[in-house]
Amino acid sequence: MRLATFNVFSGRSLADGQVVPARLTEAVRAIDADVLGIQEVDRDQPRSGGVDMTAAVAVAMGVPDGQWRFEPALLGTPGERWTAVPDGAGPAAGPAAGPAQGPAYGVGLLSRLPVLDWHAVPLASAPVASPVLVPSERREGRPRALWLPDEPRVALAAVLATAVGALTVATTHLSFVPGWNVVQLRRLLGALRELPQPVVLLGDLNLPGPVARIAAPGWRPLARVATWPATRPRVQFDHVLGHGDLPAVEAVSTPELPVSDHRAVVVQFAG
């Protein structure tokens, strides 16, 4: 069983800053995961050609209807005009959710294994702004800092049927505000403990490796690898955390892909 997390950076490439759908398809096929959590996902955004990125990833993976979902963190365009997702809105995309209702931004979860149930966990934005590092416009340039207000976040979890029983897999993209991302992580981990065990959390936690491990007592880091920036990774922001009785990890990889400023993290389980 092969699980992966990938911050898709709205489908953009660092090479030229362009969004080319074929590149995202190439990246997803290279990852070749049985279960994939994706972050910074656009739906119906002009900046990424108006595509439903989660649906495009589902096609690239060969995931059937009912086994993928997009969960919006916000409606509108991040960094521009947006509104919070209404309480109780539920998954905003996926074959069972009806037509898209305008631009949205969030996370997606896709599984080649049968999905038994879906759960979403909203995570409130920080009350303060914070500096955030963004990639340089030049491929080998140094990252630059921008002062940005925070935005709502969300986690999406699926209970999967595997050969050895139920497995819950979740994905999220936490706040860049120091400390607030720890608050969000602890709230999320508490919610995930209430779901069928074992659990694997896939995501961009915006926390360096050692901080994430300290903030998640009782959870095992299944991959200790640098993931950012993609061209020359020095920091681990993208994590795979496990809770409960999981198979042994056989291999971990961080392939360099034609899209994103992050490396994907791919974990291969035994069996």
Residue ranges and their predicted role:
Residues 103-106, 152-156, 165, 235-237, ...:
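Residues that flank catalytic or metal-binding motifs in active/ligand-binding sites
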Residues 84-100, 142-147, 225-229, 252-256:
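Short, P/G- and charge-enriched loop/turn segments at secondary-structure junctions
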Residues 1-104, 167, 182-187:
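N-terminal, active-site-proximal structural segment of metallo-dependent hydrolase catalytic domains
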Residues 3-8, 24-50, 110, 158, ...:
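Active-site beta-strand/loop signature of hydrolases that rely on acidic residues for catalysis
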Residues 12-14, 44-47, 76-80, 106, ...:
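Short catalytic/ligand-binding loop motif for oxyanion handling, primarily in non-cytosolic enzymes
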Residues 75-76, 122-128, 174-176, 255-259:
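Short, solvent-exposed aromatic-acidic interface loops
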Residues 115, 120, 162, 177-200, ...:
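Metal-dependent phosphoester-hydrolase catalytic domains
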Residues 109-163:
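Active-site catalytic loop in hydrolytic enzyme cores
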